[in-house]
Amino acid sequence: ITKDQLQEWVDYANKVGAVIIYDAAYEAYISEDNVPHTIYECDGAKTCAIELRSFSKNAGFTGTRLGFTVIPKELESNGTKLNALWARRHGTKFNGAPYIIQRAGEAVYSEEGKKQTKAQVAYYMNNAKVIMDGLKNAGFSVSGGVNAPYVWLETPKDMTSWEFFDYLLNN
């Protein structure tokens, strides 16, 4: 989604009093200039948006479950500050990620961590490119592989997904 398109959603949410839950887990994969890295690049987002961040996609933390939620202090719903409400709920229900996982998350933001994360993202994006190119060369209509390492295509009508998977493996 482009920044202009996202701005339309932010404007709409502010107009009708809605709250946007924005998943920014793939932020590290964004390569296009007109795609925002955070919803807070949009004017007015702090009064209508909650952003979810994860270390799973950019730093390979899939099994360790570390992420964070951004809830601006400006965000209210029905006169209630959502940041304070979330802090109370979170403090009551969750004791935090294990210390070793917190330290690993901290390392992601070090110079070496940033370098390794960038290399990992580039590796995954190259894999997506190889898959896209191979499928296109095989005559399939393919999309994706930009701003996220995923590739989509429609399987031929006469094949189940498993039959198509076998076809790809064997051809």
Model-derived regions: residue spans:
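PLP-dependent class I/II
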Residues: 1-171
